[in-house]
Amino acid sequence: RKTVIAAYDELMGQGWITTIPAKGTFVSDKLPEVNPRGKGVEKGPESAAGFSFEVRKHLHRPYAQLPSMLTIDEGIPDVRIAPIVEILRHYRSIISRSYNAKYLSYGSFFGDDSLREILANYLQETRGIACSKENILITRGSQMGMYLAAQLIHQKGGFSIVGETNYIAASLTLTDAGASLLRVRVDENGLNTNDIQALCKKHKIKSVYVTSHHHHPTTVTLSPERRLHLNELAHQYGFAILEDDYDYDFHYQRAPLLPLASADGGNHVIYMGAICKIIAPAIRVGYMVGPSDFIAAAAHLRRTIDRQGDTILEKAIGQMIEQGDLQRHSRKALKLYHERRDHFHQLLNDHLSEFISFQVPEGGMAFWVKLRKDLNWGTIAKTCLENELVIPDWKNYDSSNSGHNGIRLGFASLNFQEQTKAILILESAMKKESEN
């Protein structure tokens, strides 16, 4: 009965039928006009737009999601161990209370106030960053923070310094914002700050992008001496340090070095992190920490592209931090990923040592692996794909054409069995390539 009534309502709303009281429902005397598609004209989802627009080709990167295939990623968490039960428990407890219905409406474009306050304490305790909620903007992940910072700093162009090897998404974001990239060497101690100083003497530098804890992609840690030097240069030359601390929580050898933001006495560091890097990529909650006037400007810019995040999820994450759920998950994940790193290291030694060179990362979720110069990652990747293994695209790691022949191989999201299977396929592909 409900279906029939709904159908009648729809037909009446479109003008196909008319109801006359005490008589019945009849086909309308004047039917709605239907304009059939022109003969021979086909329109589908892949049709070209009938208007002009800008295609930013420099942002286009191939992306193929192949969930049915075994994948060695760039280094992401294992979503199978994500604390979903805890997240849902907190989410339900918030949304089930009638007086919390207000959280389903529009909220602050700075992010949930309670999470900002909780994060201020959390970042002080875990990273030594002295801040208040006015210094924090809740984002949908560190990439949003990177976009907002780049747009505000480089709206009128200017120079940004990045590593010779660099996180490609950051390079693209800076370039798209209008920055001209200047590259410096990266060695076992991270970005070469003497190179940065030399560039500062030649150009007006607006920003320096750094992944201080584990350089992306090579995984090296910026040394204490270079951290101090970089902060001094920022104060001397007045540039912003864009510190992307994407995997601070995963360090296996010792306690991690505190971020640059913890020793920022002149308000030059914009610090970006993400809860999704600890839990799972789909849990889109991150944060940006910086001077309060900059955070306010970023919040107003954020309002134009996203308005706000998921208030209830943000509150749930705040409760997880307050009650220690996030910290317990981090400790559990750290132990597991440490074991997986060691197992992956053994597999690389046992099966791929004649083809590659690498250093064991002290933290993070990936190895930086350099292939022999006579071998080609592109051919190897194609052979792997034929055997249902996906590996990262080597082109993402050498945008400056330095010829290092390296890629990142993530280990955290694969259990021992999956790691073994993947490395055996990779070994077979490398043997085939070396024989040709």
Stretches with model-predicted labels:
Residues 169-173, 230, 237, 241, ...:
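A generic "structured core" feature
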Residues 269-350, 357-359:
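PLP-dependent aminotransferase class I/II
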